[in-house]
Amino acid sequence: MPRATKMRVVTVDENGKELGDAKWVDIPEPDHFASDGFAQIESYVSRLLGSSARFTSIIIATPDQQMAVSLWQRAGVPEFTLSVEWRSEAERERAVRQFFSERGLSTSHDYLAGNGGVPDATRCLGYFLPPDVQFITALTKDVLRQIYHLREQDALDFSFKEHHDAV
């Protein structure tokens, strides 16, 4: 599967309703780590929390793009976001909800979005996080291990972006 080079970005409210106009943005080539991807997470989380941009994001993905999670910070509030194909990944959705509930983290968003021409194919979930590098690093590693069954030594791609003009 070829790597996507553009992404349509739109701001949505907590119910998934679009706010404002969407725009197409370039997706930069990710930083690729062929092994020990987990060892890179803390430095990216530090960059995220240290950013003064209005909106900053990190996408952490496997090189084959079969798994991806995102960390965001908007107006100083960090979030962990992910999506699941809820019809075919019901067990994963349940595991994600349980994982964050057990840690007392509240939902920032939970809505269905379109994918592949199916209007409600993808469940988009987000959770508010405390602005703590160690906590977010450990949580991210736990999600990758427990939900996605990745290992410390696995390859990971990181896309870091500061959006100074974000709303």
Task: Tell me the role of every PLM-derived stretch.
Residues 2-167:
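Structured alpha/beta or helical-core interaction and ligand-binding surfaces enriched in interleaved
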